[in-house]
């Protein structure tokens, strides 16, 4: 398992491709080791889930509105049944403000459509400091391939 000890090949592929599709063992551990190696190499890392992402570009880079969840049948009364919109800061705003390269590790990437995955790939190509790792499923051993190749398959 020399890969898990150094992470050099993973980092080299991430720098070259900018976005990787990862298939990690379901028991976990591999992603935290790689995140630790990337942080030691000077990257800022963000870990998030792909569930509930909505518009990826607005969620990651722009100021966007979020409504509170609807909790079922409510009497309207004086208050509206729909909560008021709250503005939420972009998730990657503070990380991209610094000069360091940023790695966004997205868990449960298999729930994203191919169009959403393509928009994440385009976002990485547009923003030079942003690198993305998208977990697309489980595997018996850690393996990865470029996200562009995963989209083509």
Swiss-Prot record:
Enzyme class, spelled out: translocase
Membrane topology field: Peripheral membrane protein
Alphabetically ordered keywords of this record: Membrane, NAD, NADP, Plastoquinone, Quinone, Thylakoid, Translocase, Transport
Signal peptide (residue range): none
Family recorded in the similarity comment: Belongs to the complex I NdhN subunit family.
Job description of the protein: NDH-1 shuttles electrons from an unknown electron donor, via FMN and iron-sulfur (Fe-S) centers, to quinones in the respiratory and/or the photosynthetic chain. The immediate electron acceptor for the enzyme in this species is believed to be plastoquinone. Couples the redox reaction to proton translocation, and thus conserves the redox energy in a proton gradient. Cyanobacterial NDH-1 also plays a role in inorganic carbon-concentration.
Name the record gives this protein: NAD(P)H-quinone oxidoreductase subunit N
Phylogenetic placement of the source organism: Bacteria, Bacillati, Cyanobacteriota, Cyanophyceae, Synechococcales
